[in-house]
């Protein structure tokens, strides 16, 4: 068997490590966080995925011979440590892992026969709107991570998370991560929650253009929206809407979001759907906390640069279609590091 390093312990990293170990290879998994699991551990709320399930799988993999190294930021320089740390409020402190150490890519390449990059698509898609620098605006992944980390570390006693208790919450993004933000905010005791979705409201049943066995493009009400309906009496989602401006108070805190309705029209030549703002449709939504769940753009570039692998236009690691090899010999990819999740 070969000595193989897997960089990242999310779903694809764990799957790759598990399969390679079963084929007789010696596998070491490197994780920059203080716990193994990646997205499974910190990106998905506990009420949706109990962490004892992840811990149990990790213990089984350890017993089978897989080695795990946590707080190891492979490819990072001192300046690149904790790249997701937000600058506003106390979020930076909450996200910081004091045990984190930088591990040189050259060291990994020399020590192992092959390397698998399984770092995920961890760059959150930002939004461009006036007032984006207001305090109280966070990426959804940061909000969810600090909440779960505080829960696991102290049962919330350390207060090292951003609480939505008594706050008006605005979630930007209609996907799974946005739904998790809605559910988490409600369980924290938010005053209100609104979830914005740029796309039109899906039909209840399949359209003729969306036959089986295609993925059903229909309206789905997930647990977060169901809880919002139970608590506040209405679905939190507002469709075909986006934010034009964040309004601040005198201290720079976000207090309102100026929204605008959108219209979608198919281009006769290309067949693509084009979006435009509806003139005169602006209105304001009160918000003390804004959570951006607008999808992801690609992997952390410093990891790719450290290993010398090429990136595509989406900042994902470049590989041939249907293949996993990079331009660097013995460096491969697994999972979302080489493709992008567009929705969050």
Give the ranges of each region predicted by the language model:
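FAD-binding core/adjacent interface of flavoenzyme oxidoreductases
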Residues: 1-7, 60, 66, 70-167, ...
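Fold-independent oxyanion-binding glycine-rich loops
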Residues: 9-10, 32-33, 71-73, 118-121, ...
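FAD-site-proximal beta/loop scaffold in flavoenzymes
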Residues: 133-166, 265-339
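Long hydrophobic segments that form regular secondary structure
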Residues: 172, 177-191, 275-278, 283-289
